[in-house]
Each structure stands twice: as C-alpha cells, then as structure tokens.
Amino acid sequence: MQPEPTAELRHRTVETPAGRLHLVEQGTGPLVLLVHGFPESWYSWRRQLPALAEAGYRAVAIDVRGYGRSSKPEATDAYRMLDLVEDNVAVVRALGEESAVVVGHDWGANIASVSALLRPEVFRAVGLLSVPYAPPGGPRPTDIFGQIGGPEQEFYVSYFQKPGRAEAEIEPDVRGWLAGFYAALSADTMPAQGEPDPHFVARAGGRLRDRFPTGVLPAWLSKDDLDVYAGEFERTGLTGALNRYRNMDRDWEELAPHRGAPIKQPSLFIGGALDASTTWMSDAIDAYPTTLPGLSASHLLDACGHWIQQERPDEVNRLLTDWLATLQG
C-alpha cells in the first residue's frame, strides 16, 4: 500500500553540465537522491518519495539526462558515465546540500555506484536495486556481450549499440513496446521457463518485441502509469536513453584507473530472485565482502522481477528506511 504523501511533490529544474535536469522532491531532512534506469523516469520512484518523506528525508528523484524533462544532448558521448556522475554532484550542490545518500535502480544502480566510487566526499552511502556492484575492469564490454547468445541470437545490449536500430523498432509504437518490455521482466507476466528469452533478438531480422508478452500488464503497472511512461518517450524519443548503452566501451576505458576498486561507504543491495540482472551477476554478489566492505545487507526478494521498487514497494520502502536509519547514528 502506497504511503499517503506528507507534502506535495515539488517539480523543479536545476542547472547541470548537461544543461538542465528535471527533478521531483518531497519531504525535508537528509538528502536521498533517487536515480532511475532504462526505460523509465523519475516516476519510477513514485511509491518511494512519500515513504521517504514520511520517514524524515528529503527525497529527490531525477530524470537522468536524456530522459523526461531533462536535457538531451545530441552527441552520443554526452551520455558517458563520468558526465552522469557529475550531473548527480551538480544536483546535490544545486539543492544547497554538501552530501547525499544515492540510491539507484537498473542503470541508475550503475550510475549510483560509480558516483559513490568517484565522489565519496559527496555520496556518503549508496543503495543499489536490481543491478549488483561490479568494480570497473574485466574484458571490453562489447566483446563480452557480442559472444552471448551464439550464432542464432543477439543479446539486447549488442542490439542497442547501433544508433537508430532499436529506435526503429520502438518509436513507431512506444506504448506497445514499453508495455511488452515491462511485462517481460515482471515476475507475474514474464515468459515461462523454456519460452524464448526476451533479453535476446533473433539474428535473422528479429526484434526484441517478438519475444515480449502481449495483451497483459503486470500488476504494478496501471494503464495510467503506462500513459505517463509512454507519454514521455513519445515526446522525447529513445535515443538519449539508448545512448547510455552506447557508451559502455568508453566507460570501460575511462574508468580503467579504478579497476577492481571497492566502494567503502555504507551500502545496501536489494534484488529480485527472478530478475536476470541479479541472477546473472551472482558472482558479483558473492564478491561483496571485497567489493562492498561497507555493505549493511544484501536482500533477494522471492518471486520478484526486475522492476523491484514498483513490484514490491512496501518491502523496498521498509528495507530502505530501516537502512537509512542506521546511517543517522
């Protein structure tokens, strides 16, 4: 059950290296910065904002650059991780704060973890949802993803690399594509074991949506919620959002000086037991004693898919607020 708001949501725009960045805030107290993933917006945190405000925090959910009402630079390399980290720093400064707890989901978890790694003086703690922390390093990302799936299938990350390719699939029917994508990764509507995996595209002219469920919405997603997401992407297009994937090799090169580096601040991880983003990275979770020495707890929610804070808002809110309370001592 969603908590009743303790104060009205406040929309505002702040200046960042990207130009402008839209955010929504609620509550007063220590700053908690919420960073969404793909393909989402600040709205993905709609059930966390009132809960955090009620618990005594200034909760701020941003539209990451390239999304929603935030700036959308044209250059592909404007979506490199280093720039997204500086956006987060700029938000904290623009809000008149010196530090914040940063919490991210999906790509937002990566952005949050690198923000904490590179700017520990600003981000005093980090919460990660769905995507575990894996330190910079390893083989070149596109080399890894290019080998996944074999000769018949292409991994979705590789499919997203070529500018315009995924846009051509998604943008003619944004609403239908989003509905299918959200359903494909939700616990109550994801394909059954043995059915074609929606993380892959058939190499012979296939589309991602060919493997999505049709005619069904997950329980967490109402038609009104879908209207919000679809309306934003129908207005903005998908290129800014997809450009995050197109910077993975650049990030790998630029973060090389931090190869293997741990995040030492207090941290929290919450994953879904049915989420491929969590299960495929089980080795990263096993390495947490080394990579997240400040880890307070790591939780896997049973029967939960990828959209964790929307699928299981009450549990996520409780875990977040309990953890945040430990940081105030």
Annotate each language-model stretch with its function.
Residues 1-12, 328-329:
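Basic/polar N-terminal segments that are highly enriched at the extreme N-terminus
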Residues 39, 64-68, 133, 275, ...:
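Alpha/beta-hydrolase active-site loop signature
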Residues 24-71:
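Conserved HGGG/HGGXW glycine-rich cap/lid loop of the alpha/beta-hydrolase fold
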Residues 46, 113-117, 317:
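Short, hydrophobic alpha-helix immediately C-terminal to the catalytic nucleophile
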Residues 27, 95-98, 327:
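Glycine-rich phosphate-binding loop signature in dinucleotide/nucleotide-binding domains
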Residues 4-9, 21, 69-103, 107-296, ...:
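Flexible "cap/lid" subdomain of the alpha/beta-hydrolase fold that forms the substrate-access gate
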Residues 16-25:
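A short loop-to-beta-strand scaffold at the N-terminal edge of the catalytic core in hydrolase folds
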Residues 295-329:
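Catalytic active-site module of serine/aspartate enzymes centered on a nucleophile-bearing elbow/loop
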